[in-house]
Amino acid sequence: MGSQWLQGSIRHRRLYPVRHEFEYHTGMLALDTDEWNEVTNISPFFSLERFNWVSLKRKDYFRPEAGALSDAVREQVKEATGWRPDGAVELITHPRYAGYVFNPVSFYFCYRHGENGNNGDVPAVIMAQITNTPWNDRHVYCLETTGSEANSAGWRTEQFAFTKRFHVSPFNTMAQHYEWTFSFRGPELRIHMNVVEEGKKHFDATLVVHRGPLTRN
């Protein structure tokens, strides 16, 4: 099975106008979207399209009316970049827990043929699906990577800066822009996101996780 489990921590920091931060342990699913119909077979407590302790529902993700998630993402990436992913499409997300889901952002890592996250490969395109609260609207950003070389510590880093095009939170204005950094080293993944307005960082979030096998344990 190509799907994996990510274990680590996430930190949120609001830096302006009042400083506040928190950090907590987290686990996330790294789902090979071509395994959508099989991944829940690992446990009787993991279900597809029905209530369970852990579950996946197609309506929680990109264009549920379009059929298979993997095909919908590939077509969107082709429309945005001109390249249709010919390798794995890996969804980084929180599944539903006891029927409840909260994913401010889910990432679709789109790999070249023969590459995948299990090997620490850098995706050719990262598609981010933003879901706002409390309106539950969605927007996607397609980010093309550059094929960066590893630094002396073995990290391969991709950086993006772009204008905010979607209202996410009543606490953040549309005058802001994003600075995102993705770092890859073998089974390790780091994602850092800055929210900047008028040259001042208002908020950041950092995800640090390690890949492991997806098992019933």
Label every PLM stretch briefly.
Residues 1-217:
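Mature, function-bearing regions of proteins
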